[in-house]
C-alpha cells in the first residue's frame, strides 16, 4: 500500500461498482467507511446521465465496529430489495473494510433468504487487484452466475441466431468515450450485416445474460474489461471472440478480417469484406488521405510520448508510427498486469517502453525526452501544461471534458477521423507561435519556464533574461533548459549572456 495524490487505476471496489452500475436494474451495496464512498459523486459528476447512481454505502462506523456489521449489511440489502426491486444486488467491501475480515458471504446468504432479488458478493481480492482487473472479474462473475442459474432452470438458450450476430462485451460507465465507441461499433457491425445480440454491461439486463450464447461471436473492444468473460464463454460454449481493437485504419481492417473468418467458419456461403474495407479506407475515413497530405507530412519525424491503458496506448502508438509517420520516442502503460502483451504490441514502433503506475516516473521521462506532443491521460495533460508541451487525451482516467455531449468515437472509421484531428491539433506549429509573439496576441513579458522542478540556486541576470525573450517561443524553453543544465555542470549560479553563448557552443560541439 502506498500514499499517492494521483492514481491511474483506482482501488478494486471502484471497478466492481462501475460494472454493477452499468447494468440496468442492478443495485450495488458498498460496505465501507466514510471516505471510500466517493463513487456516487464521481459518476454523477462525470457521466452525463439523468438517472441516479444505483449504489448505496453501508457505512462502517463506531457502532458497527462495536457490534459487528451483519445486522446493518443484511438490513441494507433487504431494504434496497423492497425499495428498488432490483434484479440483482451486488455487495462489495473496500480495501479498508476488508481489514475487518468479516464473513460477508454469510451476510449474503442470510439476506438472500428474505430477498426477491438475486444477491452476490463480489469475488475480488481487494489487496491484489486494481480497478480494471476487478471490473473484468466482476463482469465475468455476474455472467457466470446467470449462465449457471439458467442451466439449473433449464432455460439456457443455445440456439444460434439465423443471421450473423455478435455480443459487444466491455462497454461500461466512466470508460473513455465508451458510449460513442459503442454507437460506432453498432454501425460498423450493421454495415457488415451483423445483428447485435447483447451489449454488456452498459445498458444490459442481467435477465438477458442467458441469451449470450445465441450470438455467433463476441467482440471485446478493450482488453481491460471483457476479456475474462469472452474466454469463459469460449471455454463453456466454444464461442469465438475478436479482441483486436478496431482503432486506426489498419487495425479496423484487421478486426473486420477476423470477423469475416469467424462468419465463414459458420456458413457455406463465403463472404468477403475486402470491398467494404477498401471503400471505407479510401472514401469514408479521411485519415488515410490526410496522412499523405502536406499538413500531416509536416508532422513526420516529430517526437511524441504515448501513455495510457494498454489498449489505447498500444493502438495509439501503432497509429502514430505506422499511419502518420510520427516518431514515438516512448510508449507506456499503467496496466502493469498486462506488461507482456503491451511490450509485444509496441515492439518496433517506439524506442523505449515504460511500464509504471507512478505518475512521477512518467513526468520525469517527459521532461527528459522533451517530445513535441504527449498523448496520454488527464495526468499527462497536467504534466504537459507544466512543461508547456501540448497533450492529446487518449485514455482514461479523464476529467469532464472527455465526456463530450457530441459524437466523438475513437473506434471504427469515424474514430480514425477523430484521432487524425486530435493528433494534428495536439502539435504546436512553431511558426504560428512565433508570429503571434512578433505581432502580439500573447503575453510574452514573462519567460516561459519548462521544468517539473524549480531550480532556485540558478539566477538569471536581467540582460540574459532580455536575450532569452528575443528567442522564438517554440525553442525558448529548450534553450533555457540547456543553458541551466550547462550552468549546473560548470557550477555556475548566475546565468549571464556570456554563459548563454558558452552553453550554445557546448551544445553545438
From Swiss-Prot:
This is Light-independent protochlorophyllide reductase subunit B. It comes from Mesostigma viride (Green alga). It is found in: Plastid, Chloroplast. Belongs to the ChlB/BchB/BchZ family. [4Fe-4S] cluster binds at residue 36. GO terms for cellular component: chloroplast. Protochlorophyllide reductase is composed of three subunits; ChlL, ChlN and ChlB. Forms a heterotetramer of two ChlB and two ChlN subunits. Pfam families: Oxidored_nitro, PCP_red. It comes from the Eukaryota. SUPFAM superfamilies: Helical backbone' metal receptor. Component of the dark-operative protochlorophyllide reductase (DPOR) that uses Mg-ATP and reduced ferredoxin to reduce ring D of protochlorophyllide (Pchlide) to form chlorophyllide a (Chlide). This reaction is light-independent. The NB-protein (ChlN-ChlB) is the catalytic component of the complex. Its EC number is 1.3.7.7.
Amino acid at each position: 500500500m502506498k500514499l499517492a495524490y494521483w492514481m491511474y487505476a483506482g482501488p478494486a471496489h471502484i471497478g466492481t461498482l462501475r460494472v454493477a452500475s452499468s447494468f440496468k436494474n442492478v443495485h450495488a451495496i458498498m460496505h465501507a467507511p466514510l471516505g471510500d464512498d466517493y463513487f456516487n459523486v464521481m459518476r454523477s459528476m462525470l457521466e452525463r446521465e439523468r438517472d441516479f447512481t444505483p449504489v448505496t454505502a453501508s457505512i462502517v462506523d463506531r457502532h458497527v465496529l462495536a457490534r459487528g456489521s451483519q445486522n446493518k449489511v443484511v438490513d441494507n440489502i433487504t431494504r434496497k430489495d423492497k425499495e428498488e426491486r432490483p434484479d440483482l444486488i451486488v455487495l462489495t467491501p473496500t480495501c479498508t473494510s476488508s481489514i475487518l475480515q468479516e464473513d460477508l458471504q454469510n451476510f449474503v446468504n442470510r439476506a438472500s433468504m428474505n430477498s426477491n432479488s438475486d444477491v452476490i458478493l463480489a469475488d475480488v481480492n481487494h489487496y491484489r487487484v486494481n480497478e480494471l482487473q476487478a471490473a473484468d472479474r466482476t463482469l465475468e462473475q455476474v455472467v457466470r452466475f446467470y449462465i449457471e442459474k439458467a442451466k439449473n432452470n433449464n432455460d439456457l438458450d443455445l440456439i444460434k441466431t439465423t443471421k450473423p450476430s455478435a455480443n459487444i462485451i466491455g462497454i461500461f460507465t466512466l470508460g473513455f468515450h465508451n458510449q460513442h465507441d459503442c454507437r460506432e461499433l453498432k454501425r460498423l457491425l450493421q454495415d457488415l450485416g451483423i445483428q447485435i445480440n447483447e451489449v454488456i454491461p452498459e445498458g444490459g439486463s442481467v435477465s438477458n445474460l442467458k441469451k449470450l450464447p445465441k450470438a455467433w461471436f463476441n467482440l471485446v473492444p478493450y482488453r481491460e474489461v471483457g476479456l475474462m468473460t469472452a474466454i469463459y464463454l469460449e471455454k463453456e460454449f466454444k464461442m469465438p471472440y475478436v479482441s483486436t481493437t478496431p482503432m486506426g485504419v489498419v487495425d479496423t481492417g484487421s478486426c473486420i478480417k477476423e470477423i469475416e473468418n469467424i462468419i465463414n467458419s459458420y456458413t457455406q456461403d463465403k463472404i468477403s469484406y475486402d470491398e467494404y474495407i477498401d471503400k471505407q479506407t479510401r472514401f469514408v475515413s479521411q485519415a488515410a488521405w490526410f496522412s499523405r497530405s502536406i499538413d500531416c507530412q509536416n508532422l513526420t519525424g516529430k517526437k511524441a510520448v504515448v501513455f495510457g491503458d494498454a489498449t489505447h496506448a498500444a493502438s495509439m502508438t501503432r497509429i502514430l508510427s505506422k499511419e502518420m509517420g510520427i516518431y514515438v520516442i516512448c510508449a507506456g502503460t499503467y496496466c502493469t498486469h498486462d506488461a507482456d502483451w503491451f511490450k509485444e504490441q509496441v515492439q518496433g514502433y517506439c524506442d523505449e517502453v515504460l511500464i509504471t503506475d507512478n505518475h512521477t516516473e512518467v513526468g520525469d521521462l517527459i521532461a527528459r525526452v522533451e517530445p513535441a506532443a504527449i498523448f496520454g491521460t488527464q495526468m499527462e495533460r497536467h504534466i504537459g501544461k507544466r512543461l508547456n508541451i501540448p497533450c492529446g487525451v487518449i485514455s482514461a482516467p479523464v476529467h469532464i471534458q472527455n465526456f463530450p455531449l457530441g459524437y466523438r468515437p475513437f473506434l471504427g472509421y469515424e474514430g480514425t477521423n477523430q484521432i487524425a484531428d486530435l493528433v494534428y491539433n495536439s502539435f504546436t506549429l512553431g511558426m504560428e507561435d512565433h508570429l503571434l509573439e512578433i505581432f502580439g496576441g500573447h503575453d510574452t513579458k514573462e519567460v516561459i519556464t519548462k521544468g517539473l522542478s524549480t531550480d532556485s540556486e540558478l539566477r538569471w541576470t536581467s540582460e540574459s533574461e532580455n536575450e532569452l525573450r528575443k528567442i522564438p517561443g517554440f525553442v525558448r524553453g529548450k534553450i533555457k533548459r540547456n543553458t541551466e543544465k550547462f550552468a549546473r555542470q560548470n557550477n555556475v549560479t548566475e546565468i549571464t549572456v556570456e554563459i548563454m553563448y558558452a552553453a550554445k557552443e557546448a551544445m553545438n560541439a
